[in-house]
Amino acid sequence: MHRTLPYISLFVVTVLLQVFLFDNLSISIYLNPLVYVAFVALLPLDTPPVVLLASGLAMGVTMDFAMGAAGVNTIATLLVAFVRPALLRTLYTREGGVPCAGRLGRRVFLNYLIVLVLLHHAVFFSLEALSWMHLVRTLVRIVVSGAVSVAFIWIIARIFTAKLPVRV
């Protein structure tokens, strides 16, 4: 229970941030930060694959319900949850702990976040557009929203992992 409580709170906080703050930002049509990916990105390194996929499914369905989307969030989040173990094996060889800048190193953690967020955003915005007609516009949305999302997820990760023991 001591391991799950921080992640339940992270789930709730990322959903609330996404729904009440980031979904209401109307700065540009190209800027749509999707920070709820932080939940899947910050799950412990030794999370069993079934739990990882179930967590991704729960987050995706919750965000689809909250945003009124028809499965786009679920598909993108499940893909991120599926790819995450292979990505971590590629970037980081040790077992256990929480993925954070202090454990993985700043550069590796930043690369990890960039790959996860760009993968999520590529699937999300491609499915949202459902057309090749606005390919350049979709690519710009992926890059701009991805960069802003990575910055906010970095901040969330710093706040979330600051209070956790190293091994959690």
Tell me what each language-model feature is.
Residues 1-168:
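Terminal, non-globular segments
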